[in-house]
Amino acid sequence: MNYFALFNLTPSFDVDKAALAATYQQLQKLTHPDRFATASERDKLIALQKNAQVNDGYQVLKTPLSRAEHMLELRGVELQHEQKTMQDGAFLMQQMEWREQLDDAQHASDPLTALESLDDEVAADIKRLLSELGGFLEQSDDAANENAANLVRKLKFLFKLRHEIEIKEDALSDF
């Protein structure tokens, strides 16, 4: 399903979030199952399916990473996150350094500050990569699509790492 078409948006990495939210509200009203309470079972099922598509589409389009993945899927680019080995040696080394920093943070004199510092570094990298990703997605040639797919893989790792940092920060804050 093309969620851009569902929301009447031009496929683009940069979406008008206000327009997306407004269209979501309109589509929710049109497809909400309560509107079909007295309808036939078939119509109720169709409304439920349409409403699920609207919800799924909104979730995909509202976040940059899932929106990028959707754009690439629409272009026929397979995103085999787990199966595709990262070819960027420098990024692999950086991953190992970040993992080491994450592990070492709990033994630091001020673990929370160490985690916050790591989180700031990762957040800056995410911001930079999202900017690069937007540039590649504005193009549609094979090389740009492959570069965008590689950035999506990197961003997946970085978002997962940020989540792990948050978990460790929360655990420290509980004490």
Curated annotation (Swiss-Prot):
Disulfide bonds: none annotated. Signal peptide: none annotated. GO terms for cellular component: iron-sulfur cluster transfer complex. One of its GO terms (molecular function) is ATPase activator activity. InterPro entries: DnaJ_domain (IPR001623), HscB (IPR004640), HscB_C_sf (IPR036386), HscB_oligo_C (IPR009073), J_dom_sf (IPR036869). It comes from Pseudoalteromonas atlantica (strain T6c / ATCC BAA-1087). The keyword Chaperone applies. It comes from the Bacteria. Co-chaperone involved in the maturation of iron-sulfur cluster-containing proteins. Seems to help targeting proteins to be folded toward HscA. Belongs to the HscB family. Pfam families: HSCB_C. Interacts with HscA and stimulates its ATPase activity. This is Co-chaperone protein HscB homolog. Keywords: Chaperone. Residues 2-76 form the J domain.
